Amino acid sequence: WVLVVGLVILVMLTILAMALMKTARLEEKMAGATRDMNLSFQAAETALRRAENFIESQTAESIFDTTGEGVYNQETDEPANPFTSNWDDTDSKAIAGALEGVTSSPRYMIKKLKKIGESNLTITGYGDDDAPRPTVFRVTVRGTGGTNNRTTLLRSHYSKVF
């Protein structure tokens, strides 16, 4: 009788251990997916900062009058759907210097939209015909995580007075 009770307890412990192993494996996969998502978001944020720094570092607006290396002028359309874009050197710019843990370098596209404030009102609300008007840019970035299957796309608008 003791042998039967011992075997039943052993079978129950084995089933419990297998269920715990399955749960631990699932939690490990979820933690890996979360880490991968965080990496891709950090890569996209890095690309966004670099693209905005690129815009800010320009002293003349004329660099945005041509298209190439991730820059699109007003007349040239960037890829309509960033999800299906190739994100290669023909339509975007890669961030120099690799980030740790990501499989592909983050990339960005900058589209020059237009000058805002076409009227003679300035930010302060006072009329001034000679006030410089800011130019608005649409910045689209892509970051990947530990695998190319995990991507994050961000889009922002940035303005600068030249």
Predicted regions and their residues:
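Terminal alpha-helical segments
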Residues: W1-G6, L10-F162
